[in-house]
Regions:
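Non-catalytic DNA-recognition/assembly elements of restriction-modification systems
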Residues: 16-19, 25-27, 32-69, 193-197, ...
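Amphipathic alpha-helical coiled-coil/heptad-repeat segments
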Residues: 1-11, 147, 152, 159, ...
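Sequence-specific dsDNA recognition surfaces
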Residues: 39-44, 59-70, 76-111, 122, ...
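Residues marking the start of alpha-helices
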Residues: 45, 49, 174, 186-187
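A short beta-sheet element
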Residues: 105-107, 111-183
Length: 240
């Protein structure tokens, strides 16, 4: 699944296996997880699933914390994410604005929480917040019920089948929107917590690297924007 994440974040390649002295080291680690997966399948309403796994809904393992905030309560410099800041088919959210000048209520979110664009969900705008901030009410903030479910929740709501499901259930013709109540009904195969814990351990590490790269890139861009005009004007000179 980490390979799938790498495919939707091409600017931040993620190796499905850790790279040490050679690939064999990563393969050896993958075998360490073999015991987490049963060797038999059973029938279910969603088809065959691993024995011991269950069928559930997104709402069983995730929540939408409705932390509303009024314009007067927002610090002008607090990061603000709108739909236009969210790229399509990428969980890396490298762009945001500021709350200064906002005139309507927004939702608060925390760094590491998942943001899902509910307006025209077929645009496939899903990402992980790289900062604390506020967002448009056309964005659903999603959190796992416990940290162990983070990778599993992120993997599902950033997937094509989930986006197709929300699009099919959207209300409205010109401006179709989905809702958390619709999202929460999404049926899925639910593994035991020991599986999701192992998966989240690797997924969270990959996401943390993406977020660190975002902040590094923004810092370098700010440095460039500060120094370039001075270099062009001759205020600064580069020793030859």
């Amino acid at each position: 699944v980490l390979t799938a994440i790498a495919e939707i974040v091409p600017s931040a390649p993620i190796h499905p296996l850790p790279l040490g002295e050679g690939r064999g080291e990563g393969v050896g680690e993958s075998h360490a997880f073999d015991h987490l997966f049963p060797d038999s399948l059973v029938d279910s309403e969603l088809g065959e699933i691993p024995k011991g796994w269950e069928i559930g809904s997104l709402g069983d393992i995730a929540d939408h914390p409705r932390r509303g905030i009024r314009p007067n309560d927002m610090e002008p410099t607090i990061p603000y994410i709108a739909l236009e800041h969210m790229p399509r088919r990428s969980i890396a959210l490298s762009d945001w604005g500021a709350a200064d000048g906002l005139e309507s209520n927004k939702f608060k979110f925390k760094k590491g929480e998942i943001l899902f664009g509910k307006l025209r969900p077929y645009f496939h705008k899903v990402g992980v917040a790289p900062v604390d901030g506020v967002c448009s009410t056309d964005i659903v903030v999603v959190t796992p019920c416990t940290e162990e479910w983070f990778g599993f929740v992120l993997g599902h709501i950033s997937s094509d089948p989930f986006v197709e499901y929300t699009n099919a259930g959207s209300a409205g013709t010109r401006m179709p929107r989905t809702s958390w109540s619709e999202m929460a009904r999404y049926r899925m195969v639910v593994p035991p917590e020991n599986v999701t814990k192992a998966f989240t351990l690797r997924t969270r590490s990959a996401v943390d690297r993406i977020i660190a790269s975002i902040h590094e890139s923004r810092t370098l861009a700010e440095l460039r924007d500060t120094l370039l005009p001075k270099l062009i004007s001759g205020e600064l000179r580069v020793p030859v």
